[in-house]
Swiss-Prot record:
GO biological process: one example: L-proline biosynthetic process
Keywords: Amino-acid biosynthesis, ATP-binding, Cytoplasm, Kinase, Nucleotide-binding, Proline biosynthesis, Transferase
Species of provenance: Nostoc punctiforme (strain ATCC 29133 / PCC 73102)
Protein name: Glutamate 5-kinase
Example of a GO MF term: RNA binding
E.C. designation(s): 2.7.2.11
C-alpha cells in the first residue's frame, strides 16, 4: 500500500561533529533509501537541515554565526552547495528532486497554506522527491519555524502523511540525556503525548544544529494530532527507515491520535502564530476542554497582548499552561472591557452588538 513518508535529517546527522564537513556516506545511504522507498510506490518528502552548517564549512568558519545577517548570508552559501550535492546523488539514482524553501508566513496565510499543499501534491504526483528547508536567507525572527523538527511536522500535517521520521544523533528518546546520564531509560513507544509530561528531556542541541529533544517532542505533538505516526531514530543509519515501516520497533514511536484533528483546526493550532493570550477560569476551561463548548467572555480572567479580530490566541489556565488555541471574535481592546462579563452585557458595554462568543467552538482547538 502506498504511504506518504516525511523524513527529516538534522545538521548533526548530515555533518561530521569534529569538522562540520558533510558526512557524504550518510547522505548517500539516505538517498539510496529514499529512492528505494520511491521504487516501492511510496511518496517521499525530505526535510533537510544543514545549510548554515555547510555554509560555515565552505567559508572556513569554526563556529555557527550568531548575528542574523551573517547567519542568513552563510545559509545562502550553504543551501546552494547542499542542494547540488543532493541533486548529484539523486541524478545518479535517476530520481528527480525539487527544492522547496518555506517561511512561516507561507503557512500563516490560509491561501498560501493551501497553495503549498497543492504544490506538494503535484510534485508527489509527478514522482518527485521534494527537498524542503526553511528559507533562512529571508526569514525574519518573528516568522521563523525555529527548527526543522517543527517544519517537518507542519509539512507532514499539511500533506496528511502516514509517517514522519525524525533522524537525529541518538538512537531513540530517553528519560534523560544519555550523553550525560549513563542510566537514562530508553523509551520505545509513546502511546499518548501526556506520557512525556514528567520526563527530563535534554534540551541542548549539538553545536552544529538548533534542535534538541524538546523540539522533537513538540514536533511529534503536532504530527500525531494530524494522524501521522512519528519515529525518532538515529540519522547515521537511514536504512532503518525501511525496517521500521516493515514493522521493526527501532527508535521511539509516537502513536498517532485515533481521530486526527481537522485540517483547518490544525492550521489554527500550529500554522498560525498566536498574537496574545487569554487566561481562563476553571469553569471556562471545563466547558471548552470537557464539553466542547465555545469560549464566552464571562470565563476570561485576563487578556494579554495586542491583537485584532480573527487573530489566533492562546487559551491558558491560571498557571499559564496552554490548553487551547482559537480565532477571536473581538480585538484585545474590546476584550479588556468585556472580560468576565455576561454575553447579554456586551452590546451595552461596547456600544454595538457583537458576537455572543469570544471564540466559537468551530474556531477552537485543544492543544
Amino acid at each position: 500500500m502506498t504511504k506518504t513518508i516525511v523524513v527529516k535529517i538534522g545538521t548533526s546527522s548530515l555533518t561530521q561533529a569534529e569538522t562540520g564537513q558533510l558526512a557524504l556516506s550518510t547522505i548517500a545511504t539516505l538517498a539510496e533509501t529514499l529512492c528505494h522507498l520511491r521504487s516501492q510506490g511510496h511518496r517521499v518528502i525530505l526535510v533537510s537541515s544543514g545549510a548554515v552548517g555547510v555554509g560555515c564549512a565552505r567559508l572556513g568558519l569554526t563556529e555557527r554565526p550568531r548575528a542574523i545577517a551573517l547567519k542568513q548570508a552563510v545559509a545562502a552559501v550553504g543551501q546552494g552547495r547542499l542542494i547540488r550535492i543532493y541533486d548529484d546523488l539523486f541524478t545518479t539514482l535517476q530520481q528527480a528532486i525539487a527544492q522547496v524553501l518555506l517561511t512561516r508566513s507561507d503557512l500563516v496565510q490560509r491561501s498560501r497554506y493551501l497553495n503549498a499543499y497543492n504544490t506538494f501534491q503535484e510534485l508527489l504526483g509527478l514522482g518527485v522527491i521534494p527537498i524542503v528547508n526553511e528559507n533562512d536567507t529571508v526569514a525574519i525572527d518573528e516568522l521563523k519555524f525555529g527548527d526543522n523538527d517543527t517544519l517537518s511536522a507542519l509539512v507532514a500535517s499539511l500533506i496528511e502523511a502516514d509517517w514522519l521520521f525524525l533522524l537525529t544523533d541518538v538512537d531513540r528518546l530517553y528519560s534523560a540525556d544519555p550523553r550525560s546520564v549513563p542510566d537514562a531509560r530508553p523509551i520505545a513507544l509513546v502511546s499518548s503525548i501526556k506520557e512525556l509530561a514528567e520526563l527530563q528531556i535534554g534540551s541542548q542541541g549539538s553545536q552544529w544544529g538548533t534542535g534538541g529533544m524538546v523540539t522533537k517532542i513538540s514536533a511529534a505533538r503536532i504530527a500525531i494530532a494530524a494522524g501521522v505516526r512519528t519515529v525518532i531514530t538515529q540519522g547515521r543509519f537511514p536504512q532503518n527507515i525501511e525496517k521500521i515501516i516493515q514493522g521493526e520497533l527501532i527508535g521511539t514511536h509516537f502513536e498517532p491520535q485515533p481521530e486526527p484533528t481537522s485540517a483547518r483546526k490544525r492550521w489554527i493550532a500550529y500554522g498560525l502564530l498566536p498574537a496574545g493570550k487569554l487566561y481562563l477560569d476553571e469553569g471556562a476551561i471545563a466547558a471548552i476542554s470537557l464539553a466542547g463548548k465555545s469560549l464566552l467572555a464571562a470565563g476570561i480572567k485576563l487578556v494579554e497582548g495586542e491583537f485584532d479580530t480573527q487573530d489566533a490566541v492562546q487559551l491558558c489556565d491560571s498557571n499559564g499552561n496552554e490548553i487551547a488555541r482559537g480565532l477571536v471574535n473581538y480585538n484585545s481592546n474590546d476584550l479588556q472591557k468585556i472580560r468576565g462579563c455576561h454575553s447579554r452585557e456586551i452590546s451595552t458595554i461596547l456600544g454595538y452588538a457583537g458576537a455572543e462568543t469570544v471564540i466559537h467552538r468551530d474556531n477552537l482547538v485543544l492543544i
